[in-house]
């Protein structure tokens, strides 16, 4: 039984552009237990088997969504973050780099507490999830607090 069926959605596959399979158009995604269980192309959806499968899954699905005009993509991976620094966004952002670091950021970082780093990390994770990032590698101080 499907949890979610999304019809008419475009899907980035992760295949190379040269393969010609980098993007699927007007597919049906069948999602079970939080995972994509099946992807039916537009052609497959129109076969008797495909239509029967979609009808069965749609009949049992908690949600049936129209994905027209939307794109499903694999989760993004951010391999270099300073995640808690999101707390300093827009802080003295009109300064040149070294002036910004030496006179604004480094003095502010010296006042960071473990709790503030954890709050900044949670904020950064929420922002990444909203933009499709599902995994990150952090390069900031307070590694244990970031992990917590």
Language model regions located:
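N-terminal metal-binding scaffold of metallo-dependent hydrolase/deaminase domains
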Residues: 1-56
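Histidine-centered catalytic micro-motifs
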Residues: 74-86
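Divalent metal-coordination and catalytic microenvironments
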Residues: 9, 29, 34, 69, ...
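Active-site gating loops and adjacent loop-to-helix segments of metal-dependent hydrolytic enzymes
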Residues: 87-119
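Residue-level structural signal for beta-strand termini and adjacent loop
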Residues: 41-45, 77, 89
């Amino acid at each position: 039984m499907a949890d979610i069926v999304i019809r008419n959605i475009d899907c980035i596959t992760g295949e190379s552009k040269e393969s010609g399979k980098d993007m699927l158009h007007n597919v049906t995604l069948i999602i079970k237990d939080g995972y994509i269980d099946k992807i039916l192309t537009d052609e497959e959806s129109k076969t008797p088997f495909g239509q029967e499968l979609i009808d069965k899954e749609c009949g049992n699905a908690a949600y049936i969504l129209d994905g027209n005009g939307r794109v499903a993509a694999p989760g993004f991976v951010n391999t270099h973050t300073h995640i808690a620094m999101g707390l300093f966004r827009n802080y003295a952002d009109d300064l040149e780099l070294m002036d910004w670091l030496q006179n604004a950021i480094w003095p502010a970082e010296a006042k960071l507490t473990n709790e503030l780093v954890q709050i900044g990390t949670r904020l950064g994770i929420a922002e990444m999830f909203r933009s499709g990032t599902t995994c990150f590698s952090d390069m900031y101080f307070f590694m244990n607090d970031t992990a917590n």
